[in-house]
Amino acid sequence: MSQESPKPTIQMSCASVPLVHEVEVLDEAGRRKLTHIPGERSLTIYLDKREVVTLMTLGGAPEALVLGYLRNQRLVESPDDIESIQVDWETDSAAVKTRRSKVDIDALTSKRVVTTGCGQGTMFGGLIEEMAEIRLPDGPQLTQEAIIALVEGVRVHDTIYKKSGSVHACAVFEREGGHGVRLLHFIEDVGRHNAVDSISGLMWLANRSGRDLMFFTTGRLTSEMVIKGAQMGIPVLLTR
């Protein structure tokens, strides 16, 4: 295990909302039936009372999503810089208060790059140009058995997708034993860019390095997903 200490201390809300909704629909034969659809709601992030972005999200792990978004956009240098994250679903907002801010937000957000992917994500600053400077470790050696075990670990997970469909999933694993893997984090969201940000936030809270981890996502690996994986220091990315 490559977990380090001490972990950052951030005052955080534990906001929750229903993740699926039951609705009445008509099937192909005109019969009425009940089915489930995933929720999708807006979440506007305020950094020291300044509006940064509005995300459309399932809402399953909003505090981790906010932290991971700020991390991957480099709007905050360290979790120790953050005093609190308070999510309020009545106002669809997340208020982030910092202890200190070393980032010039105006300069960073002045340049935007629209990345590939159906959601057309946006990345701030010259991050793409700086990707060449990121050096990743070799990572864990993977066998075919380990990859099969990883995919199976995702498949058997109790997921929103099984109930309603229309969501993406991301997960991180570590090697365990000869050909085994252990699931560390599993997140579903309406966009996989949100799911990877949420996992990034959870890893930051745990002060966990990505150097010995494997990252899994449903759907294709867009440029945004690859960039975020590199930022998290994860050397192995897999998709189904």
Predicted regions and their residues:
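Intrinsically disordered, low-complexity regions enriched in acidic/Ser/Thr/Pro/Gln residues
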Residues: S2-F186, V190
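Feature captures the catalytic cores and cofactor-binding loops of soluble hydro-lyases/lyases
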Residues: R192-R240
